[in-house]
Amino acid sequence: MYVVFEGIDCVGKSTQISLLKEIYKDAIFTLEPGGTELGKHLREILLNKTHPISKRAELLLFLADRAQHFEEILKTNQNKLIISDRSFISGMAYAKDFENDLLFTLNSFALEDFFPQKIIFLKGDENLIQERLSQKELDSIEKRGIEYFLSVQDKLKKVLHFLKEKISIEILTLDAKESKEKLHQQIKEFLQ
């Protein structure tokens, strides 16, 4: 089973994944971008830009990472439990300047139509996101501000709705304000 955690920065994806690592010791844990050696280099380019990158070039770098991630991680472990911190869904949401149909087609190509079966979508309100952003050093994407993150979160919701029409997926939407223990319990039940 291929499971992905989705949500903007600071909603607790990494915390919940860490808790699952204690339970699912044989699972494959990965992330996008950066789940492969190529992906680590691309992630560094994308998060710590020293030169401006066009939106189209940025999209194609993310797609290159996704295609490599599919070949190295997803394809070789299709019969195992795979838990990923983000996926193509975030890629579609962050690529706000492009149409969903185009993004879906490009991602289908990069993934050879291998999509997650279960999605855990953690969402946060403005106060929670602002509080958590203020507690960390920000990368170039995080420096875009709270309004940017809220618009991405809104786009994530729209992308998930769009995907329900395209592929067979189960989605669990959770409020990131809940305690990590309560969220963990709900996630464990969803994965059963």
From Swiss-Prot:
Keyword Cell inner membrane set for record: no
A Pfam family: Thymidylate_kin
GO cellular component: cytosol
PROSITE patterns for the chain: THYMIDYLATE_KINASE
Catalytic activity: dTMP + ATP = dTDP + ADP
GO biological process: dTDP biosynthetic process; dTTP biosynthetic process; dUDP biosynthetic process
Cross-referenced SUPFAM superfamilies: P-loop containing nucleoside triphosphate hydrolases
Annotated InterPro entries: P-loop_NTPase (IPR027417), Thymidylate_kin-like_dom (IPR039430), Thymidylate_kinase (IPR018094)
Enzyme class (EC, first level): transferase
Molecular function GO terms recorded: ATP binding; dTMP kinase activity
Residue numbers binding ATP: 7-14
Protein name: Thymidylate kinase
Organism: Campylobacter jejuni subsp. doylei (strain ATCC BAA-1458 / RM4099 / 269.97)
